[in-house]
Amino acid sequence: MEFHFDATFFAFVGLILFLALVVYLKVPGMMARSLDDRADQIRNELAEAKRLREEAQHLLAEYQRKRKEAEAEAAHIVAAAEREAEMLTAEAKKKTEEFVANRTALSEQKIKQAEADAMKAVRSAAVDLAIAAAETVLAKKADGKVQSELFGNAVGQVKTRLN
């Protein structure tokens, strides 16, 4: 049996020695551990990403709920403001109508009072004129006896009216 020590043989021996050295230094275990660590790290990152995604979805749902609540509250506030504005408008209209009615009634009352005062003044002036005319007529036509009798009758009428 003859051995040929050519380059192929030495390459094979080198390969065997290299593999023995790799096994002796526990390189496959270190590689497996490194790959396991990397797999664990990736698994943890995926779990963290899933947790963050769920948290983001929860926050999104919460913000959407809060937005809907805020929109509902804003709609409620707007509706309340509209109702209050309508009430204030109706109240202002009612007060304005009452004010106009009061002013109209007061003006009508003043007009009636002015008419009554004018009628009294006209009557008083007519009475004064009639008295003056009667006095003038009586002064010209009546003598002393008739004047005394008229004066007595007038005083008697005044006494009866005062009592």
UniProtKB/Swiss-Prot annotation:
A cellular-component GO term for this protein: plasma membrane
Any Pfam family matching the protein: ATP-synt_B
Keyword Ion transport included in the entry's annotation: yes
GO MF, one annotated term: proton-transporting ATPase activity, rotational mechanism
Transmembrane segments: 5-25
UniProt subcellular location: Cell inner membrane
Key word Iron-sulfur present: no
Domain of life: Bacteria
Topology within the bilayer: Single-pass membrane protein
UniProt keyword list: ATP synthesis, Cell inner membrane, Cell membrane, CF(0), Hydrogen ion transport, Ion transport, Membrane, Transmembrane, Transmembrane helix, Transport
Signal peptide stretch: none
Family classification: Belongs to the ATPase B chain family.
Function: F(1)F(0) ATP synthase produces ATP from ADP in the presence of a proton or sodium gradient. F-type ATPases consist of two structural domains, F(1) containing the extramembraneous catalytic core and F(0) containing the membrane proton channel, linked together by a central stalk and a peripheral stalk. During catalysis, ATP synthesis in the catalytic domain of F(1) is coupled via a rotary mechanism of the central stalk subunits to proton translocation. Component of the F(0) channel, it forms part of the peripheral stalk, linking F(1) to F(0).
Subunit comment: F-type ATPases have 2 components, F(1) - the catalytic core - and F(0) - the membrane proton channel. F(1) has five subunits: alpha(3), beta(3), gamma(1), delta(1), epsilon(1). F(0) has three main subunits: a(1), b(2) and c(10-14). The alpha and beta chains form an alternating ring which encloses part of the gamma chain. F(1) is attached to F(0) by a central stalk formed by the gamma and epsilon chains, while a peripheral stalk is formed by the delta and b chains.
Name under which the protein is recorded: ATP synthase subunit b 1
Gene (name only): atpF1
